[in-house]
Amino acid sequence: MRFKKSLTCIDMHTEGEAARIVTSGLPHIPGSNMAEKKAYLQENMDYLRRGIMLEPRGHDDMFGAFLFDPIEEGADLGIVFMDTGGYLNMCGHNSIAAVTAAVETGILSVPAKATNVPVVLDTPAGLVRGTAHLQSGTESEVSNASIINVPSFLYQQDVVIVLPKPYGEVRVDIAFGGNFFAIVPAEHLGIDISVQNLSRLQEAGELLRTEINRSVKVQHPQLPHINTVDCVEIYGNATNPEAKYKNVVIFGNRQADRSPCGTGTSAKMATLYAKGQLRIGETFVYESILGSLFQGRVLGEERIPGVKVPVTKDAEEGMLVVTTEITGKAFIMGFNTMLFDPTDPFLNGFTLKR
């Protein structure tokens, strides 16, 4: 048996959503920032993503990330996110997993008697400032982790999208929380958020994302490479009394987020804040389709003079952005050495999804 390549990974989940983090075995990936590394992987080495994410090593709802040395000043780790359909500029649940793994596996050293360990991630969407909160009396056991996300904002409000029957005309908000989201109430689609309705939610989410990218142009005003709606966030009434809403996010190749979605939580908080429905410092609890929870807060707001998006009323006053924090719990499930045999007919993975 002769192996073409081997990769080492940490297999984790954050509030139920998979996070397979590749820690070593990659060749040199060119790029002067994480966005360029992401683009290089996509254009030249996408077989790696497929082999790691898809069957038989992964599954149709797999998620993961590549770790790199950081490039941006002040960062501890570089990271590029991936799923079964491609790559994302940012991911909240996988950032929480990476922060947790960095501390619990010794990737980063932990100061003596520390209770909170800062971990700064260099992502394609910008710097994400994480904190691993340690269990009392331990040196590296993480009770949960928080991330301060990249600036988030409501981009466009009450966008009318026409879908095939039985959905018809649907109104959505478009917001950015590290990725662009189309945010839609479940009642507008006529579907309750439940595991039993998952296939219908996936179908509606994929239809909506396809149509919104066909009919609506989005462009991050400061990051030229971010110009598509990557995720559809369907929300409704919470089941858990602690939560404000329940949601499911559809992304990738009809993937459904098992966690409450970190970047989606930021996008939702930015939307609520812009509408006057959430205050700075107020706790916002978001529930997933599984019933797991993220805790979020808006930490502050800022106006960027001269920069505008469709909801900006006064270009001189500028675009409103908010700083958001998300907290959740990630678990290490195992350490994985992946072997790639050149004679394997499924070397680079496969999917049975159409």
UniProtKB/Swiss-Prot annotation:
Q: What is its EC number?
A: 5.1.1.4
- Residues the record marks as active site: C91 (proton acceptor), C261 (proton donor)
Q: Where does substrate bind?
A: G92, H93, D257, G262, T263
Instruction: Report if keyword Isomerase is assigned.
Output: yes
What's the superkingdom here? Eukaryota
Give the enzyme class: isomerase
- Record-stated family: Belongs to the proline racemase family.
One Pfam family named in its UniProt record: Pro_racemase
What's the gene? Answer: PA45-B
Q: What name does this protein carry? A: Proline racemase B
* Reactions it catalyzes: L-proline = D-proline
Task: Please classify the protein's predominant subcellular localization into one broad category.
Answer: cytoplasm
| Any GO CC annotation of this UniProt entry | cytoplasm
Q: Function of this protein?
A: Catalyzes the interconversion of L- and D-proline.
Localization, UniProt: Cytoplasm
Note the subunit structure.
Homodimer.
Biological source species? Trypanosoma cruzi (strain CL Brener)
Q: Which GO molecular function annotations are given, in alphabetical order?
A: 4-hydroxyproline epimerase activity; proline racemase activity
Q: Which UniProt keywords apply?
A: Cytoplasm, Isomerase
